Amino acid sequence: LPEKRINVGKKHLQTLRNLETRCHDSFQAFVVIDARSSSTRTNVFLAKTRSCPNRGRSIDPDSIRLIREGKRFTGLRVVLEEWLDTYAGKDWESRPVDARLLFQYVPQMHEGAKKPMQLLEEDTVAILDSQLNEKQKVQVKALGIPAMLCSTAGVRDFHEWYRDALFVLLRHLINNPSPAHGYKFFTNPFWTRPITGAEEGLFAFITLNHLSRRLGEDPARCMIDEYGVKQCRNDLAGVVEVGGASAQIVFPLQEGTVLPSSVRAVNLQRERLLPERYPSADVVSVSFMQLGMASSAGLFLKELCSNDEFLQGGICSNPCLFKGFQQSCSAGEVEVRPDGSASVNEDVRKNRLKPLATYCSVNNPEISFKVTNEMQCRENSIDPTKPLAERMKIENCSIIKGTGNFDKCVSQVESILVAPKLPLPANIEAASSGFESVDQVFRFASSTAPMIVTGGGMLAAINTLKDHRLLRSDFSGDVEELAEAAREFCSSEVIIRTDGPVIQLPNARGEQKLNSLNFDLCKTMALTVSLLRHMAAGENQPSFIKWEKSIAGPDGKPLADLGWQVGVILHHVLFTEEWGRNAYEAGYSHNL
């Protein structure tokens, strides 16, 4: 009997000793705040962590899951513009402003940032409370929640010191959350900052290849060469991501590719985007401002309707709009009414030319001190010396009418957006990487890698044609098939029904309700056709092209949407030692 009790005691002691030396798994939440061009939105992720004695804690990258997207709140550009309206005075975009004097109003900028950040915090807490079980809540609160707030093209071209100052304030607000809910949010200057266009594209590239399981440490991808050196091939796919204010093109290069000396490729390991243990890859990553859905719409109207070929007697004939559709001559946001008329929002901030017109100001040092930047603005019919209202105005134009001529639409999209004579304004970053326009990307560099196109507008264009059986359900990027389908769709006429306006397709292919989301869909189709033609004209062509919103897991459920959000998490957590120092050694306790 004593021997039995002795063995029980030994076993109990051994169990406790094993607990001291074995690894422990727990869950950690991540908050990625997408400060995009139109709004700011929280994305809450959950991942499994493993803590091992003497090795620290690391994240299992395959466990990262989006648990919910948050609500849309005020964009950072609005926060900055409202602060400038108040302290620089109305119409600051049209006159000289002494930026140095505005430093005295930094406390007021801090106050202005508090409200949107409070709303984001409350929204995030509501998601965590509703989506986590009790055990997960305990673990998430104990580990703290890394927060990564990144701005993309929405404030990328915002001049002076205002943007960077705002980010100092945002980091302070994140690091000082309300104590009431018990969640400990924390961040640092590496995680919360404006990201460049190239970074946005590279993070989207990492997201795509991680979720589709092309990116990893798979031994099957590696071999030992004749010199005893480990060589790993990559099976990576490229991505074309089109947002609201910019478009990113990223693809891997074949081994041995020779590029012009002016073109800069990015090595994922050398630039510390991925650790050395991952297969090495050189990629092209370029981002173009003014090629997002909203920004390109404003610039396209400004240029098209300033051209005498399309502007006659105050009427601009737009080949990218349906026959029977008309609107007032403005780049403001359009609402299609039930009676078929189009109401254009006259609010300056709702004008899709506003960001570009703000940039193209003689009061912006990027314009006043750099002649080439001023030339680019003037090439696009924007005179930097004029007041903001005039920079946004389309001269001598009162009405825009659709003509539904898709071939002419493609030619204008090509000449205005894809292959302009001069680089589109605010594209210093793209030019510095060796590309002044989209057509140059595939002329100077190309790849046989698969290409995935993502972005709401691009997906809507393809899915609309599939819905009307104008494209095959398995459409894989044949440019002439797409051009023929779009040509038929865009020749449709707007008809007013009792329940509202519809697009009446030719050849008895049915009807589709006309609304504020699809009235200018043909411009997006034309952009897609132009893009595919340039891909096909390159020295190498993609093995296939697909349009995707998200990547599904083995259970068929989406793992996460494509975009840069998962990529920015991976970029940080895969460097385990650095991540351990920032997230666990310092962590939220750094701010105590």
Swiss-Prot record:
**E.C. number:** 3.6.1.15
Gene it is expressed from: NTP4
Instruction: Name the PANTHER family on file.
Output: ADENOSINE/GUANOSINE DIPHOSPHATASE, GUANOSINE-DIPHOSPHATASE
**Annotated disulfide bonds:** none
Molecular function, one GO term: ribonucleoside triphosphate phosphatase activity
Please spell out the taxonomic lineage of the organism that makes this protein: Eukaryota, Sar, Alveolata, Apicomplexa, Conoidasida
* Catalytic class of the enzyme: hydrolase
Pfam families on file: GDA1_CD39
Species this chain originates from: Toxoplasma gondii
Protein family membership: Belongs to the GDA1/CD39 NTPase family.
Question: Record's InterPro entries?
Answer: GDA1_CD39_NTPase, NTPase_alveloata
PROSITE patterns, sorted = GDA1_CD39_NTPASE (PS01238)
* Listed name of the protein: Putative nucleoside-triphosphatase
